[in-house]
């Protein structure tokens, strides 16, 4: 009889109260990739412009702007691809855990 009561109580609980940890983990993941989206392209832009294209390769100021911008755009796409990969795996993991309940 007690098992039936516990099963009924678990069925009546709203789903948002069962997955508070997954919401916090999702928010942490989102904030982490937001920080990456801001810092990585900007950092790579100025680093590659100053040290690689102008410093090591001896390019002009105008050419180094162009190539550093390409590096920054590629970095944005890499961060986005990593975010999609992590979000996809996190969602499928939560789906599997929910399916086992």
UniProtKB/Swiss-Prot annotation:
InterPro entries in UniProt: Vma21 (IPR019013)
Q: Which residues lie on this side of the membrane: Cytoplasmic?
A: 1-25, 87-101
Q: Name one GO cellular component term.
A: endoplasmic reticulum membrane
Q: What domain of life is recorded for the organism?
A: Eukaryota
Give TM regions: 26-46, 66-86
Q: List each coiled-coil range.
A: none
Q: Please give the residue ranges for the topological domain Lumenal.
A: 47-65
Keyword Metal-binding attached:
no
Q: What keywords does the record list, in alphabetical order?
A: Cytoplasmic vesicle, Endoplasmic reticulum, Membrane, Transmembrane, Transmembrane helix
User: In its UniProt record, which GO terms are filed under biological process?
Assistant: vacuolar proton-transporting V-type ATPase complex assembly
Q: Which Pfam families would you find in this protein's record? A: VMA21
Q: Provide the topology term for how it sits in the membrane.
A: Multi-pass membrane protein
Major localisation: endoplasmic reticulum
Give all cystine bridges in this chain.
none
What is the annotated localization of this protein?
Answer: Endoplasmic reticulum membrane; Endoplasmic reticulum-Golgi intermediate compartment membrane; Cytoplasmic vesicle, COPII-coated vesicle membrane
Subunit info here reads: Associates with the V0 complex of the vacuolar ATPase (V-ATPase). Interacts with ATP6AP2.
PANTHER family found in the cross-reference section: VACUOLAR ATPASE ASSEMBLY INTEGRAL MEMBRANE PROTEIN VMA21
Say which family it is in: Belongs to the VMA21 family.
Kindly give the HAMAP family that the UniProt entry links to this protein: VMA21
Question: In UniProt terms, what function does this protein have?
Answer: Required for the assembly of the V0 complex of the vacuolar ATPase (V-ATPase) in the endoplasmic reticulum.
What is the name of the protein in this document? Vacuolar ATPase assembly integral membrane protein Vma21
Question: Native species of this protein?
Answer: Mus musculus
Gene that produces this protein: Vma21
């Amino acid at each position: 009889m007690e098992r039936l009561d516990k099963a009924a109580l678990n069925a009546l609980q709203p789903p948002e109260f069962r997955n508070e940890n997954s919401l916090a983990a999702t928010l942490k993941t989102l904030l982490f990739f937001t920080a990456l989206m801001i810092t990585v392209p900007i950092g790579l832009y100025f680093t590659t412009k100053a040290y690689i294209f102008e410093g090591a390769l001896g390019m002009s100021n105008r050419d180094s702007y162009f190539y550093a911008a390409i590096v920054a755009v590629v970095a944005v796409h890499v961060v986005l691809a990593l975010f999609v990969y992590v979000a996809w795996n996190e969602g499928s993991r939560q789906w599997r855990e929910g399916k086992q309940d």
